[in-house]
């Protein structure tokens, strides 16, 4: 009987401790959530500014995101609309190169409506350190080679790595990775440029 009481007492105590830990954890979460959200938002803003210069827009880019549902936008996961005084001046969009050496390479691309690439940044990848990871801005300047490059029907052959007859450098011992980034930037830019009417419709959803 005494053993049963002791066991019951310990059970109640452990339950109380578990409840207390849950309450404390929840309290910490709610106290820090706003700060965490603010840090994430600041990081997102900084990344967007790397592909669309500030003088291109005066709207809130973070609040301008649209997830395209139309089949014409296959390969483009999210579009941010940069607007200047209510008019669309550029797009930043997330796209994925499916053919990296070690899998998907997620990209953020800035593009104006005339086909000028304003910037490209890698959001996520699993490429080989010391080889394919040179696509990261913090490791090399290679990704800056896209900035201010135009794409149109007359120069499509230039949008390839030099090994394939294009103008973009490849990496020594790692051609697959830069090829994947160049090709997906090209493919996705053409999707955007060939669907201006649909983009105009989507832009009405944001301020």
From Swiss-Prot:
Example GO BP: electron transport chain
Transmembrane segments: 11-31
Record-listed FMN phosphoryl threonine modification sites: 175
GO cellular component: oxidoreductase complex; plasma membrane
Listed EC numbers: 7.-.-.-
Protein purpose: Part of a membrane-bound complex that couples electron transfer with translocation of ions across the membrane.
PANTHER family referenced in this protein's UniProt entry, alphabetically: ION-TRANSLOCATING OXIDOREDUCTASE COMPLEX SUBUNIT G (PTHR36118:SF1)
Listed NCBIfam families: PRK01908.1, rnfG
Record-given protein name: Ion-translocating oxidoreductase complex subunit G
């Amino acid at each position: 009987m005494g053993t049963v009481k002791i066991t019951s007492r310990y059970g109640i105590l452990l339950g109380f401790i578990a409840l207390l830990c849950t309450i404390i954890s929840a309290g910490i979460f709610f106290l820090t959530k706003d700060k965490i959200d603010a840090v994430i938002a600041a990081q997102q803003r900084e990344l967007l500014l790397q592909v669309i210069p500030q003088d291109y827009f005066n709207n809130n880019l973070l609040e301008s995101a649209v997830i395209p549902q139309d089949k014409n936008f296959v390969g483009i996961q999210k579009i941010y609309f940069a607007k200047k005084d209510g008019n669309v001046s550029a797009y930043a969009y997330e796209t994925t190169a499916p053919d990296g050496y070690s899998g998907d390479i997620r990209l953020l691309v800035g593009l104006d409506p005339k086909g000028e690439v304003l910037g490209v940044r890698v959001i996520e990848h699993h490429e080989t350190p010391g080889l394919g990871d040179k696509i990261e801005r913090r490791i090399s300047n290679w990704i800056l080679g896209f900035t201010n490059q135009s794409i149109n029907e007359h120069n499509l052959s230039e949008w390839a790595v030099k090994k394939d007859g294009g103008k973009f450098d490849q990496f020594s011992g790692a051609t697959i990775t830069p090829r994947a980034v160049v090709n997906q930037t090209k493919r996705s830019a053409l999707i955007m440029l060939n669907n201006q009417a649909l983009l105009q419709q989507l832009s009405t959803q944001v301020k």
